[in-house]
């Protein structure tokens, strides 16, 4: 098993796979009673707390403790000011006012890739959020995460959810938000070929 997971770990690059390989190496060494190596690999997996195996690894080395996702880097004020003064940004806001913001998607992708080191991805995701296109912000953040740049604020949007509907308590907001992110990426107009609609992609006859 050790050789298998080492080979797996050495041949993947995306955080979700790196965390998986490291976690199972941690489990393998734990089974072999190599505590130091086990902790080493669990710690490596726990660097990727937005992944399932990263969270499992965190619980292995920090039983009973809660974790917090890292905050986004701070973008310098001068770069932020310059970014939001650009004509293309004004055009994106104009498209939003005309209810044609779907055409802004590729403009936002372009802006995101312009100056990554100075925070163009973060500002493009912020701009997408400003026009209520959380789905575009998530897509920008997802692409960044494949290169191990994590913009958690925009990759995991938080919107308000009711606690009660018709006197009935509904599930915790974290559970609801996770379903929305998976099913529609917070796209209010999402419609599937099968007929599912809305944020949670419900079928009309089950809604």
Where are these regions (language model features)?
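Catalytic glycan-binding domains that act on GlcNAc-containing polysaccharides
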Residues: 14-17, 28, 32-44, 55-58, ...
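Alpha-helical adaptor scaffolds
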Residues: 1-13
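TPR-adjacent "capping" and linker segments in tetratricopeptide-repeat scaffold/adaptor proteins
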Residues: 73-86
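Alpha-helical segment of the N-proximal tetratricopeptide repeat
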Residues: 86-103, 107
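Structural signature of alpha-solenoid helical repeat scaffolds
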Residues: 13, 49, 79-80, 112
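Helix-turn-helix repeat elements of alpha-solenoid scaffolds
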Residues: 1-3, 61-68, 96-103
């Amino acid at each position: 098993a050790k050789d298998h997971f080492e080979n797996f770990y050495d041949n993947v690059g995306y955080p979700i796979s790196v965390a998986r390989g490291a976690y199972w190496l941690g489990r393998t060494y734990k089974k072999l009673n190599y505590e130091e190596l086990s902790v080493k690999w669990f710690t490596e997996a726990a660097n990727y707390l937005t992944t399932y195996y990263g969270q499992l690894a965190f619980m292995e080395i920090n039983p009973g403790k809660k974790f917090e996702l890292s905050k986004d880097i701070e973008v310098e004020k001068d770069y932020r000011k310059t970014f939001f003064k650009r004509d293309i940004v004004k055009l994106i806001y104009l498209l939003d006012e005309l209810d044609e913001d779907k055409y802004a998607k590729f403009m936002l992708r372009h802006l995101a890739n312009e100056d990554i080191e100075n925070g163009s991805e973060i500002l493009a995701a912020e701009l997408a959020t400003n026009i209520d296109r959380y789905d575009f912000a998530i897509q920008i953040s997802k692409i960044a995460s494949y290169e191990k740049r994590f913009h958690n604020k925009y990759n995991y949007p938080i919107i308000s959810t009711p606690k009660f509907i018709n006197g009935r308590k509904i599930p915790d907001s974290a559970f609801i938000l996770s379903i929305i992110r998976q099913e529609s990426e917070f796209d209010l107009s999402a419609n599937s070929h099968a007929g599912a609609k809305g944020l949670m992609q419900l079928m009309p006859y089950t809604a």
